[in-house]
């Protein structure tokens, strides 16, 4: 499940996100594109993700960058963080992966 709070600039991603949930992500991702601040992606509730979510977040980051904004990835569990790193999302310009110690 993906939702966006425009007042806080937080995109919350929870549960399982894969190719079968792509259509449900479109509206919150589109809303996040219009953010007037940097966007924080709260991944703390995400149990499973595949490459489709990472690609959607990469596109969001590219579009936000064109508007002078950044995408901050926060609260990723180890397996999700591994996928972020494998897909290279954390190396994209304007993407910051916040890792808890």
Locations of regions flagged by a protein language model:
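STAS-like cytosolic regulatory interaction modules
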Residues: 1-52, 58-101
